[in-house]
Amino acid sequence: MYLLIVFLPLLGSGVAGFFGRFLGSEGSAIMTTTCVSFSSILSLIAFYEVALGASACYLKIAPWISSEMFDASWGFVFDSLTVVMLIVVTFISSLVHLYSISYMSEDPHSPRFMCYLSIFTFFMPMLVTGDNFLQLFLGWEGVGLASYLLIHFWFTRLQADKAAIKAMLVNRVGDFGLALGILGCFTLFQTVDFSTIFACASAPRNSWISCNMRLNAITLICILLLIGAVGKSAQIGLHTWLPDAMEGPTPVSALIHAATMVTAGVFMIARCSPLFEYSPTALIVITFAGAMTSFLAATTGILQNDLKRVIAYSTCSQLGYMIFACGISNYSVSVFHLMNHAFFKALLFLSAGSVIHAMSDEQDMRKMGGLASSFPFTYAMMLMGSLSLIGFPFLTGFYSKDVILELAYTKYTISGNFAFWLGSVSVLFTSYYSFRLLFLTFLVPTNSFGRDILRCHDAPIPMAIPLILLALGSLFVGYLAKDMMIGLGTNFWANSLFVLPKNEILAESEFAAPTIIKLIPILFSTLGAFLAYNVNLVADQFQRAFQTSTFCNRLYSFFNKRWFFDQVLNDFLVRSFLRFGYEVSFEALDKGAIEILGPYGISYTFRRLAERISQLQSGFVYHYAFAMLLGLTLFVTFFCMWDSLSSWIDNRSSFIWIVSSFYNKKSSQQ
């Protein structure tokens, strides 16, 4: 049963990929959706047995690599962390598959799309169930490859090509850091198995590595692993690929942002909690990185006009919350927020897809407006998703995001206070752009063409069913799962997560945090909604004052251009590498040394040599006789010199033999 959870999506992908032309669009969609749905049902059974029954399952399938000290095998671990991730991945993926049946029905390449979607789903369970770093890395690279294929699905669009290449290249930076971290783990622990590494994590706390500076070994490994998480989970510095990934079909965006690729980094940090707990420096770096990411993405999202990009930046911001929750050693709350976030983020993306699908692929919110009367169901779904996103009381997002902020405050450290205040300000911006999206899309007077309004329609039944199920999750999952997963005294994560006793602050955040600290997120959410209402729906004079202010214009330009991250990376890194590639790789090597030492140089040398030799053919006999005499003289001279040298070598060998024999006789007499 456990193996079927992992390999059923692979079966569906293989059938759709190899036999899609015979099954057709409907047959491929039914096959892939059925396989992923059965995987989701089996994940629920595994959750009951493993998480609720408190009985982890470990499977060793077969040896994989065995080379002297390096030994890796195919193995799967099913603990509470794994089964929670499996439910999130398979349940969201099954709904996305069902949604895609209607959304992609008119696309001629629908079987290929369903094949890619299922292979994407397969690699994520492979990542979360692996019992060693090597298997995790296989799933890690697999989701990167599948995301490239899905973002690049409409390959005739230039922007889709550029976005897919950008996602692949930016993630290569993080993947390189992860690979170095795995290599460091093997160097330090002589294994890549999680169980062995985590059991020995406390032993090398005082091990040091000298590379022009003295570095703690565990800290270095954790920083390298963090680089991998920064790339995959779109944290500050390597976050630029995530908004551009919106060039793929909307179901792809929902799957990437809600359940698969971007959650891999958070999962990896939670899985490696026994390592990170013994590196306070790495935890501080994680906290600062997550807090800055949440603030950066929130401030960027308030000025985006693309419907999907606004939701994409909200994903980036929420990932920042998950990362800095890991930085303050609350991995359980981070994973809980990951699970809650999956429901309302998938709901937001699929609701946006319903609008885009009905509006003939229009994504600019400024060209919409007044759609609440035409899309009452979609409007209700997006309203519920937005309220859950901002942490509206008693909805799913409220039970995890507010807890993260309270924990950051009661950490009572500089990094904790930094994360709390930046996270709280990010709540204000999150509320602002969430309500701005609702106002510009559904409530302001319409800016669409009349023909578009007349022919638009609400979500059909196959697209509405996933929205209803996700809406129920966005309303009730947080309330139902809070006490089980992050309640005081729960042992839900006992077999998967590790926290040092000195870092346990959940009880303190529950009882010692001041009431005003608990109310700050709600107050900021209300303020953000009020500002969005006044700026976008009521007060035109505020917009005019904003446009005439020099400072506001510069601030607008700064946020609208994404803090100039793309420009800085292009000017200082991309162009430098392209220039280096042209001047060194192309001109100096390809067209220089390789050509000279390679085919061009060899052919030129032999051609010139042949021309020189051909000039010796003068036609005079005495020239040939002189050449023969010269050659014979050189031949005889060489052999005479060789005979003299060889005789000298032979005489020296004889002398050594005589002396050694005399020495042996003398030794025997003594």
Curated annotation (Swiss-Prot):
The keyword NAD applies. Its EC number is 7.1.1.2. Pfam families: NADH5_C, Proton_antipo_M, Proton_antipo_N. Disulfide bonds: none annotated. It is a multi-pass membrane protein. One of its GO terms (cellular component) is plastid. It catalyses: a ubiquinone + NADH + 5 H(+)(in) = a ubiquinol + NAD(+) + 4 H(+)(out). It is found in: Mitochondrion inner membrane. InterPro entries: NADH_DH_su5_C, NADHpl_OxRdtase_5_subgr, ND/Mrp_TM, NU5C-like, Proton_antipo_N. Belongs to the complex I subunit 5 family. This is NADH-ubiquinone oxidoreductase chain 5.
